[in-house]
A protein has these predicted regions:
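Short pre-active-site segment immediately N-terminal to the catalytic Zn-binding motif
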Residues: 123-139
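Charged, well-structured alpha/beta interaction segments
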Residues: 22, 26-39, 43, 47-50
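Flexible, small-/acidic-enriched active-site or ligand-binding loops
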Residues: 98, 102-112
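Post-HEXXH active-site segment of zinc metalloproteases
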Residues: 105, 138-139, 150-176
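Short polybasic amphipathic segments
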Residues: 117-122
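Active-site recognition of the HExxH zinc-binding catalytic motif
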Residues: 27, 139-147
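Helix-adjacent hinge/juxtasegments
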Residues: 45-97
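Single conserved hydrophobic/aromatic residue that forms the stacking wall/gate
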Residues: 1-6, 11
C-alpha cells in the first residue's frame, strides 16, 4: 500500500540485506531510480536508489550542460541503500523538478523541494553515515523518505493537478 508509514528498522534483522537487494532488483526491473519499502508493502524505514554516478561535478555547470554531458559520457550505476534515513538539514532554496513515481506509473508533475539536503542513515554494513546530496539525488532521497511517511509526490502539488492525475490513474487502472 503506497501510503503505508514505515516503522524504525531493527539493524540486527538478518533479512535486511536480502530485502535491500530485492528492493534494488525490483526498482531496476521497473526502470525506477528509487524505491521505498512501503511501496512494496514492507512497513520498514528502508529506501534504495540509483541516480547514477558521473565523473564530473554537476555544480560546475548548468542543467543543460549537465544533461548534454550525461548524453555524451553516460552514467555508471551507483546504488545506495539506506536504513532508517532521516533528513537532518536542508537548503532553504527550493528547486522545481519533474517527478514521477513507480506507485503512479506514467504520471509526472513538477514538485518544489529543497535543492540540497543532509541525511543520516545506516548502510547495509550497519555503519552510520551522513550524506550531503544535491540535485537529482537530493530530490530522490526526499521523494523516497516521503513514501516512508505515507506521502506521495502528488501531495506536494495543487489540489486541482492532484485530482486530475488521480482521476486519470484510476480510469487507467480500471481499464486493466
Amino acid at each position: 500500500h503506497v501510503s503505508l508509514v514505515g516503522s524504525e528498522m531493527c539493524i540486527r534483522d538478518r533479512n535486511i540485506i536480502t530485502i535491500l537487494d530485492d528492493m534494488l532488483e525490483t526498482m531496476y526491473n521497473a526502470n525506477g531510480i528509487g524505491l521505498a519499502a512501503t511501496q512494496i508493502a514492507i512497513d520498514k524505514r528502508l529506501i534504495v536508489m540509483d541516480c547514477g554516478k558521473t565523473n564530473f561535478d554537476p555544480k560546475d555547470m548548468s542543467e543543460e550542460e549537465y544533461n548534454e554531458k550525461i548524453k555524451n559520457e553516460g552514467i555508471e550505476p551507483f546504488p545506495i541503500k539506506m536504513i532508517n534515513p532521516e533528513i537532518i538539514s536542508f537548503d532553504k532554496n527550493l528547486k522545481e523538478r519533474e517527478e514521477g513515481c513507480l506507485s503512479i506509473p506514467g504520471y509526472n508533475a513538477n514538485v518544489k523541494r529543497p535543492s540540497s539536503i543532509k541525511v543520516t542513515y545506516t548502510d547495509e554494513n550497519k555503519k552510520n553515515k551522513t550524506l550531503e546530496a544535491n540535485g537529482l539525488l537530493a530530490t530522490c532521497i526526499q521523494h523516497e523518505i516521503d513514501h516512508l511517511n505515507g506521502i506521495l509526490f502528488i501531495d506536494h502539488i495543487s489540489k486541482l493537478k492532484r485530482e486530475i492525475i488521480l482521476k486519470k490513474a484510476i480510469k487507467e487502472y480500471a481499464k486493466n
